[in-house]
Amino acid sequence: MAIKKYKATKDNTITNAFKLDLNTRATGSNMGASDILEVFSIYGQQTTSSAELSRVLLEFPISNISSDRTAGTIPASGSVNFYLRVHNARHSEQLPNNFTVNVMAVSQSWQEGIGLDMESYEDETKESIEGSNWTNREKATAWAKAGGEYHSSSYVAGKTMPNYT
């Protein structure tokens, strides 16, 4: 079976995590220019109002995929499998052996942004700075729901497999 690879055309990490002062949420932060996509949830906070969450936004070239189906490069009808390959970046923090990543199709367009700061979350998108964040999908245009709106019928959950190379 032939394999066809598609790379994301844009990406961003958005979060509602607390900033270093532990009083302010980083809901305006943007990490669109970072070369790392950070997925986290603070242990023990998953069901509380103080939960700190992150979401990774990825956009793939859907028009290219559609064109490849029409051209017969990939099957024009029936099932086609898509796999998302991720890697663990080296860092000093301890990771759980196993955690679940949920993949959902975002239902609204969004801007990538130019933020880099994943520690103190100081790169914020505002009316004059493009990019998505926890509350806005672009500059000053809000998501339908904080944290991004997605198609609930397009949902996949999968376990990560540790890759310690």
Predicted regions and their residues:
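Secreted, disulfide-rich extracellular signaling modules
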Residues: 1-165
